[in-house]
Amino acid sequence: MTSRLVASLFVILAWAPATGQEVRVPSSAGEIRLSYAPVVKRVAPAVVNVYAARVVESRLPMFDDPIFRRFFGGGSPREQVQRSLGSGVIVDPAGLVVTNFHVIENADQIKVSLADKREFEADIVLKDQHSDLAVLRLKDTRERFAAIDLGDSDALAVGDIVLALGNPFGVGQTVTHGIVSAVARTQIGITDYQFFIQTDAAINPGNSGGALVDLGGRLVGINTAIFSRSGGSQGIGFAIPANMVRGVIASAQGGSAVVRRPWLGAKLQAITPEIAESLSLKRPVGALVSGVAARSPAARAGMRTGDLVVSVDGQEVDDVNAFDYRFATRPLGGTAQVDVLRSGKTVKLTIPLQTAPDTGRDELVLTGRSPLQGAKVANISPAVADELHLDSDTEGVVVTDLADGGTAANVGFQKGDIIMTVNSQKIARTSDLEKATRESVRIWRITLVRGGQQINVTLGG
């Protein structure tokens, strides 16, 4: 057997010079050893565990039985504490931690456990459901913490090695490795900004909010979801790109409670095979402009209905989701070059990068005994329209959130519903809606618009 190994080695070594390549045999165990330990040692102190607790009211299951309720009544709700766990990443030595929005959603108390086992309570500085990201600040400390540097996620290539760090199943900090399986995954349906890094590094429940790093120890993504039939890792995990995370951090560091992103002021639609054929495209690619709001950045730059957006700052746009990501990650204050196809020719547009106007939002939560009790509503400003992906010139009052257990959520109202009338009263401002829902009536007739379709709702008082 030894002679066969020697012969095989000889054949390999003898072949190498014929190719003109120099091959050197490893001369020590150190040269053979491949280890990610130096990278892990550098980044692990910046990866934390996030524990969230929320108080919810619930009844004993027996009270769901109508016969039981008939004799004993509805029963008083009991307060219960629900707990969730996830991961986070320290991105600022002052104690700013990035995690997923879904990890801390509706949390009444948040604790962060460091790699050295110390625990700190944390406040929510910013939360952004659109990107499924949130920023926390460690409380009552002037300490400087180990923080991780952000990398350029757009520089990632399929096949690059990456490491995933987090707290799967609450067992403690865990490191897994894999490769970038795909970039620019846009049809996942996890967040409004559907643009993800796909990796086969093992990601499990509890890893949400953890770090995806390259071999330089730079943060290239925040782990957020897995595709699984079993609930555990099956080699298909998704991370929010670091370039999206960068804007969220910048907003938090600037003192904003919401993410400040560039506003386009145009409505884009997907390219279907039929539209692609009508435009003489070889394949469905790009995003079609179906409307431009007056006085918006898009209008000022000369964008027109019918333009086909094909790139942003030289980066190709395959679909609407790709455009949303590319444009949203551009820094405010400058400009972006957007290339469009118009009548078969490429036209270069310079779009100013500014936030949408947000005056007169007048947001409030509806109370009382109407079917809209528990709905948070706002006047539709360009900023609100941009947040909810409505047409920029939409007017009226829109549902921006729904309280868990509120009447509005229970009867089926949804975030993004535009309330047009209540009992024949036209609703133009939130004050109109507040006044209309204070009335005591037996029948509620509400007209709303959802997804461009008008819906008439009739409910008992």
Question: What do the PLM-derived regions correspond to, one by one?
Answer:
Residues 6-14:
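Bacterial N-terminal signal peptides
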Residues 17-27, 34-38, 87-89, 101, ...:
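C-terminal recognition in membrane/secretory proteostasis and scaffolding
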Residues 21-38, 42-97, 105-107, 118-119, ...:
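Glycine-biased strand-turn-strand hairpin within the trypsin-fold
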Residues 23-24, 29, 36, 58-60, ...:
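Active-site loop architecture of trypsin-fold serine endopeptidases
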Residues 49, 92, 98, 111, ...:
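Hydrophobic beta-strand signal
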Residues 85, 91-92, 114, 119, ...:
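Short, acidic, Ser/Thr-enriched surface-loop or helix-capping motifs
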Residues 113-117, 141-142, 167-170, 343-345:
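Hydrophobic alpha-helix/coiled-coil detector that fires on Leu/Ile/Phe-packed helical surfaces
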